[in-house]
Amino acid sequence: MGRGGAGVVKFNLVDRIEHLSDERIVAVKYVSLAEEYLADHFPTFPVLPGVMMLESLTQAAAWLLHKRTDFACSMAVLKEARNVKYGTFVAPGGALRVEVELNKTTDTGATFKAVGTVGDGNGNGSSAVALQARIELAYFNLGDKQPALAELDRQLREHNRRRWAVLRAQSAEVAV
């Protein structure tokens, strides 16, 4: 899954945390023309692909799970996306503001209500919905089913803690 090996995220689609509580996270994904996937989506009208917007919601929800559990599990992956509705585009120079609210936790994951908005570019503070969805994440350790992978779980949890430390530092003025 990317150059870093199994379970390592290739595309980091959360650039900043604006708010974090036990039940809710607000994060931002800044869109730059330098992002490689924009070259093909679409060459004359580059916009953040819908699947990447959904992944941004998923990554924000994963950070909420990791923080709630003090990084108890190595894997937080999208299990199901329901009622996904796309609205406006997110173009380079724009920002996708992601709000994810915890709906329900289970022994194996959690469900969330999530929405991504983008400013109208007029500087008046109004925004439009880029997407909304109800998502379910599975939260687990690989070693739970294959004990030989317990060491990989430890490495992945440590990797996630290091990524969180960088993200937290970039969001320092916010209580995260």
Residue ranges, per PLM feature:
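Short, Lys/Arg-enriched N-terminal segments with co-localized hydrophobic residues
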Residues: M1-V8
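Conserved positions in beta-strands of structured domains
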Residues: D15-E18, R82, G87, E101-N103, ...
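HotDog/MaoC-like acyl-thioester-processing domains
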Residues: D22, P92, E101-V176
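Active-site helix/loop of acyl-thioester processing domains in fatty-acid/polyketide metabolism
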Residues: I17, L48-F71
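Hydrophobic beta-strand-centered segment that forms part of the acyl-chain substrate-binding groove
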Residues: A60-R97, Q132-R134, F140
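Short, hydrophobic/aromatic-enriched beta-strand segments in well-ordered soluble domains
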Residues: K29, E99-L102
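Hydrophobic core residues within well-ordered beta-strands of beta-rich domains
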Residues: F11-L13, L96, A110
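Catalytic strand-loop segment that frames the active site of acyl-thioester-processing enzymes
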Residues: V8-L48, A175-V176
